[in-house]
Amino acid sequence: MSNALLLRKFLRQTATAVLLGTAVVGLSAIVACGDGKEAKHAKVPSGPMPENETWTGVYFHPVYGHLHMIEEGANVVGRWKRADQSKWGELSGTKGGNVLHYTWKEHTVGMVGASATTHGKGYFQYKMDKEDRPILDGQFGLRDDEVGNDWHNVKQARMTPDLKSIGGDSEGIKPGGF
């Protein structure tokens, strides 16, 4: 075999080994590290629920509309329809004192497929404002994040929650139902 053929064979084997080694190391880094981001969690202390107050009720936000919530033991479920009627959502979570940690889904009206629904986590802290009105002070995040977007609601007097009035599921949702 000539020196040129031996050199070409050596270079081809070396290049193949380097490419395979690089691919294995790169794939290992991707699998081991994921996307490198950790979920963001709320650091909100739980306190006692304000006297004579309950999570059950209807709350209002100018963008997210009316949020209907029902408390069942340690669980709270809710549904909302945006003020512009473009989306509706559902949440389910566990309360501890005046703090509720929940998971949520929001569905775009008239849209189907994977992009029609977004989901995430969030929290609410039940408080009384300066005028002694009950409010929900909280945030929600996308996917595994629990924070990132503010969501503040004022509890509406003399409104009864009706989960069945919102969304595409006539049965409503049950605690932990999604």
Where are the predicted features?
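Bacterial N-terminal signal peptides that target proteins for export
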Residues: 3-20
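Central antiparallel beta-sheet cores of small beta-barrel/beta-sandwich binding domains
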Residues: 42-132, 140-178
